[in-house]
Swiss-Prot record:
Periplasmic membrane side: 70-270
Keyword check for Glycosyltransferase: no
Domain of life: Bacteria
UniProt protein name: Protein tonB2
Predominant location: membrane
GO biological process: protein transport; siderophore transport; transmembrane transport
Transmembrane feature ranges: 52-69
Keyword Cytoplasm included in the entry's annotation: no
Species this chain originates from: Pseudomonas aeruginosa (strain ATCC 15692 / DSM 22644 / CIP 104116 / JCM 14847 / LMG 12228 / 1C / PRS 101 / PAO1)
Amino acid sequence: MATPQPVDARTQPWRETPGGDLVALGRPVRQALHLVRHNPAQGRVLSRRETILLVLFALTLHGAVIHWLSQQRTPALPEVPPQVPPMTIEFTAPAPPVVEPPPPEPLPPVVEEPPPPVVDENAVKPPPPKPVPKPKPKPKPQPRPKPAPKAVEPAPPAPPQPAAPPAPPAPAAAPAPLTPPSANAGYLHNPAPEYPALAMRRGWEGTVLLRVHVLASGSPSEIQVQKSSGREALDQAAVKAVKRWSFVPAKRGDKAEDGWVSVPIDFKLN
């Protein structure tokens, strides 16, 4: 059985229908193809008036959008509360007095002994002294009668000698050096003063110099503002804190005594 070959409409203008009739298809198809090839579909061209209207409409639309965006309120930024930096309170302890050592005792002067004289055996010896002639004996005088001895008066008694003055008392021993009291926040665990809220908000800073009377037990009994910081709030905060402090009392030797100490307190905001 032969395989049917495809038929081109351009080469085969006739087609056999199932009923056996022949239909001429070549001419109508060729005319349609000719029209499509020589008359392609053309798009509709806008007129000048329509173009101007479209441009005006686009500009109006863009202007409305820009106006609407400009009327929108910018959202307010969130308020950030001011942050207070950490507070640094410095404590400066007064320098301890320098105890000068006693000067050394002067050494006794060394007395140099004169060297012994050197005897020169070869030196010329002096001539021996001449013998002294013996004196001639004088005639003995004749004894004369002696007068009677007078009575010897007794000597007056000697005045009593004054008693020797008593020996001066031995000088008292030198007193032991006095060590002033001190406040060391490092090992005494003294709490730092609280920074007043008003001074913190207004940025007040200053140094308060306190004069503290320390008992032998180490507790403060009296606090005086020796030099103010210029802010009453800072002065009161310093006095309030030092009332709770513990001090190293003054000592004379190994014995604790009452004493005064100066305590500077610095209030600084970093």
